[in-house]
Amino acid sequence: MTPLVLVHGGGHGAWCWEPLLAHLEAPALAVDLPPRSIRGGKDRHADVPELAMLTIGDFAASVLGDADAAGYERFVLVGHSMGGLTISEVARRAPTRVAHLVYVSAIVPPEGRSAIEAMPIELREPTRAAVDATRGGGANPVGGLDETALRFMFCNDMDEEQTRFVLDNAGTEVAVALAEPAWRAGIPPDLPKTYVKLLRDQSLPAELQDNLIANLEASPGGAVEVVTLDTGHDVMISRPHELAPVLNRIAAGPPDIA
């Protein structure tokens, strides 16, 4: 089976994939994007200098470095939420190494536009303010959400134990990457692509995900397989047994999509 490389989204880290790993049949690597010090643990809300400097390109380079270290020459690339920006950039840089792109309720802006422009309208101005604060050397609040926001955005389909897992690990994020233009030009249109649409998602609602799927169909083009799951945003935590069969099938071979 083709190895899986799992890329987390905003405010998350490799920790978010832990409940899923036991359900996977293929070798799997869950990566921590830089800065790694904020990916869970006591420093997850730290305002470190890298938050104002890192780019989507830095994220992609980190993923490729981790894949090299794991000995993965070719792999299925899975991106959750903000991780959609990263996996697209990895595929642009190293298209022959990516066997399949899997976007799990992932952000896919219009070509050359920022993640902010693909967000729900009510989140755009607060996120722009966070980016401005970070560029100005102030505290970076993106991902450092309060408990009420975390429960609403990520935990609406979780039991209390799963919710506690999120609350104890979710941290801050690189806000400036959300304002950076995102590109998919250079990804071969025939590279297999799957979008996992989450129907109960309160972070990226289902109707918004339809727009993101349309963006992916427009660029890089080609067929996009859409799989729907009746879950909230953090499906790998709340319903790992439902996401795993999708990834196991993809890792076992190319999907049959028209």
Residue spans of the language-model regions?
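Active-site loop/oxyanion-hole signature of alpha/beta-hydrolase fold enzymes
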Residues: 33-75, 92, 115-118
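Gly/Ala-rich beta-loop-alpha elbow adjacent to hydrolase catalytic centers
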Residues: 78-83, 87
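Short, proline-enriched alpha-helix->beta-strand connector loops that line the catalytic pocket
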Residues: 2, 188-193, 222-224
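Active-site nucleophile elbow and catalytic-triad environment of alpha/beta-hydrolase enzymes
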Residues: 168-187, 191
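Short beta-strand/loop motif that positions the catalytic acidic residue
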Residues: 195-197
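Conserved loop-alpha-helix segment in the C-terminal half of the alpha/beta-hydrolase fold
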Residues: 199-230, 245, 249-250
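Conserved HGGG/HGGXW glycine-rich cap/lid loop of the alpha/beta-hydrolase fold
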Residues: 2-45, 66, 73
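Flexible "cap/lid" loop of the alpha/beta hydrolase fold
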Residues: 92, 97-98, 102-138, 204, ...
